[in-house]
Amino acid sequence: VKGVTMLLEEILKQEQERFIKENLLSDEMLELLKENIMPFNTLMAYYRCAIMEVETKFKVLNEEFSLQYDRNPIESIKSRIKSMDGIFKKAKKKNIPITMEGIEEGIRDIAGVRVICSFPEDIYMLADCLLKQDDVVLVERKDYIKNPKPSGYRSLHLIIEIPIFLQNEKKMMKVEVQLRTIAMDFWASVEH
């Protein structure tokens, strides 16, 4: 029984490797992944820290508006880190080198924060408040509210750089911030 179990485990492992090779990654990508797994995990941890920084900034703004104006402009805050598979697919599509530097420089939406607002005017007010903070750097702005996509998609996208403070250094990390209303978020989920 023990031998059969070991044989089944080995077959399962081989099938998993075959599936990965055939469906997700080439041998070259698999080797790069094995060589870079620790730096990649570290980079993903940095992105998670950057998300926490951005979420905190929006929570503070929401609290401030609650105290000053007796209302909350933010309905919800959602965040995500792009999956490893998503990162590799985007890198391949955009001809970005599969290196830590290539990924960090070439893919700007690895970390994402979506802020759902009650009203359209809240979107611009929150974006302005965020961008006025002296540790936030605007890298790119795409206004799909004023210029909707042909599909009807509407949202304000900001690529920002924000510092994370590590044990011995400060590191600037890119985060994509999407601001939209509840109605725009519903449309985006239907459209996607």
Language-model segments: residues:
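Short, Lys/Arg-enriched N-terminal segments with co-localized hydrophobic residues
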Residues: 1-5
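An acidic, glycine-/histidine-flanked metal-binding catalytic module
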Residues: 7-51, 58-64, 176-192
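Terminal, regulation- and interaction-focused segments at domain boundaries
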Residues: 110-117
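Glycine-rich, low-complexity intrinsically disordered segments
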Residues: 20-24, 42-46, 73-77, 103-104, ...
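A glycine-rich, hydrophobic loop/mini-helix early in the fold
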Residues: 64-110
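Long beta-strand-rich cores associated with HINT superfamily self-processing modules
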Residues: 104, 117-192
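Phosphate-end processing signature that detects enzymes handling 5′-triphosphorylated RNA
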Residues: 11-14, 97-101, 148-150
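Solvent-exposed alpha-helical segments within well-ordered globular domains of core cellular machineries
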Residues: 52, 56, 85, 89, ...
